[in-house]
Amino acid sequence: MAQTQVKATEGVLEGKDLSGITVFKGVPFAAPPVGNLRWKAPQPAAHWDGVREAKEYGPNPMQEPIYGDMNFGTKVNSEDCLYLNIWTPAKTMKEHLPVLIYFNGGGLMAGSGSEARYAGDAMARKGIISITANYREGIFGYFAHPQLSKETDYKGSGNYGFMDQVAAIRWVKDNIEAFGGDPNRITIVGESAGSMSVSALMASPLCQGLFAQAMGSSGSVMGFQKIATLKEAEDKGVALAQKILLEKGKKTGKKVGKDAGKKCLDELRAMPAEELLKLASVRALPVYNVDGYFFTEQPTEVFAKGNQTKVALLVGGNNQEMTPMSVLRGKQPTVENLKEGAKALFGEENIDGLFRLYGINSDKDVLEQPGVDLASDMFLDYATWKWGNMHKLTGGQPVYRYRYCHPRPAMAIKGKVAALAGGVVDAKEGAAPVRRDNGAVHSADIEYAMATLPTNRVFDWQPEDYMVSDIFSQYYVNFVKTGNPNGLGLPEWPAINGKAVAPVMQIDVETEKAADYTCLQFFRYPVSKESYKEKRNTCNARKNADSADL
């Protein structure tokens, strides 16, 4: 029988035995960020007397049903959301097991540690402690404003969701020995916005010494553009506050001045969370910023100087992260329309060279792999590659790259279509059947990596899916245990450090080494007619490199 009572800093917790492992759900790692604590750094959780039951998930963070396909373990959303969940196989405090902390994806505006695909029981049965932790999202987690900045010693604001993640890691480091864990063997992990968070945590001075390894899947905060300055974030916060007050004024009949958004903090703090969420109604990636506290400079500058947390890193993404339709924005799939969609990011003068580099030469290329490669790089692939590459150059620690390639099987249910967050939404009446993906779409890797395929009943999982999951999840577990994904019976996975042609592990039914590439790594500067051929040839050489040479 596993030990179900544990003494944490704040008091005694009573968990639940799951046939050899113990799960503790809804464990508070910080005070509820409500009332006057709205838009403040997380504060310590309160102590309690007696035994606190930890058998049910705490509330999800406040969020709108943006994706419509997330499978939560609780139906309750609340501003009081700073809870974590622990799955431990330890029988005593003295086992010193390695620890995984998973931060959910969802664009920093949706998602929760209660989602079934992140559940840690399968990983715990492989000999590690697995943890999920919530953090504030959307306007509750990433709202900057001049009035908020005046309240802080560092004269900045925003980034509260990232600070929640720091608080969760600190709580785990301070308490995990009581659950049989090793505070010096913590690995932080995330997918999509969770992966962006891991890269941000590595760049923050608040995290030095808090974790031993890091893993990221499909995302980083080091993309094509710099993150916002504090002034830019504050200005956007004022504009959002003005929008909220105007929307409320329409309902109440109250007249709102043109500068009301500049001095409205008391009113916004007093607003019920549900009302604030609806009035803000922002369905875009929140604005995080160089606030002078969580971020003291641009993350790219931190990594360029070698000032990031220097730990082993396992990083990668999927081979079909995004469809070209995201670049086309509703227009027909032609080269000219795809160029028009890409110009906003790359500029008119660069677009022809860029398309030659990708091999997008005719309309048929637009929806095929060349167009998919461009759309995926624009979405998250390039940012993910840049994170791993910069850490390779200045981190002084091993970096392991992967590319997840295995497509999900056919759906087990009818009348649905797959959505971005991993689940399904209702198919539109009369819509043409959606063809099965040729590769791994965004978020498709999560259940395979976390060995949680049975929790997702949308897809008709086949033996080959479980085989891929066994391989991928074992790489994950090995990395958490040792900082190296390699292990007995697995294909060799070399680090990319010191390699002219960096190796990437292609995770599939046939898992093997290949060449690590993204065409955009050769597109750091405008492509002249004289240089694009050389760049294109180099990109193709990396694509076609013989794995035996890696």
What is the role of each PLM region?
Residues 81, 154-177, 232-235, 239:
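Alpha/beta-hydrolase active-site loop
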Residues 69-74, 154-159, 222-228, 299-300, ...:
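Active-site rim elements
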Residues 385, 389-550:
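Mobile gating loops/cap/lid regions near enzyme active sites that modulate substrate access
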Residues 105, 164, 192-195:
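Active-site loop->helix "elbow" adjoining a glycine-rich segment at hydrolase catalytic centers
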